[in-house]
UniProtKB/Swiss-Prot annotation:
Belongs to the pterin-4-alpha-carbinolamine dehydratase family. This is Putative pterin-4-alpha-carbinolamine dehydratase. Its EC number is 4.2.1.96. Keywords: Lyase. The keyword rRNA-binding does not apply. It holds the Pfam family Pterin_4a. GO terms for molecular function: 4-alpha-hydroxytetrahydrobiopterin dehydratase activity.
């Protein structure tokens, strides 16, 4: 079984993810990104999808043109786990090298 983060673990782990916010009413985190255009957004999503498949941990996301909204939570644990933290860290790493639009 996958270990759901305790309140203290969650607080500590989220300190290292300043671009992510808690989802109201859910044990989940989210981040919104904007890119130069649809191709940039879709390319970003493709990179994340490949990693998510390797991890067997898939984000909830929404895309319209240059915008990508990502929500992370582990369904099997009914909340936030280390898998979500690891995927969020990977997403942040990709963003740091992709330069999303302001």
């Amino acid at each position: 079984m996958i270990h759901k983060l305790t309140s203290e673990e969650r607080k500590t782990r989220l300190e290292g993810l300043p671009h992510w916010t808690a989802v109201p009413g859910r044990d989940a985190i989210q981040r919104s990104l904007r890119f130069a255009d649809f191709n940039e957004a879709f390319g970003f999503m493709t990179r994340i999808a490949i990693k998510a498949q390797e991890m067997n941990h898939h984000p909830e996301w929404f895309n319209v043109y240059n915008r990508v909204d990502i929500t992370l939570s582990t369904h099997d644990a009914h909340g936030l786990t280390e898998r979500d933290i690891a995927l969020a860290q990977f997403i942040d790493h990709v963003c740091a090298h992709t330069e999303p639009a302001a």
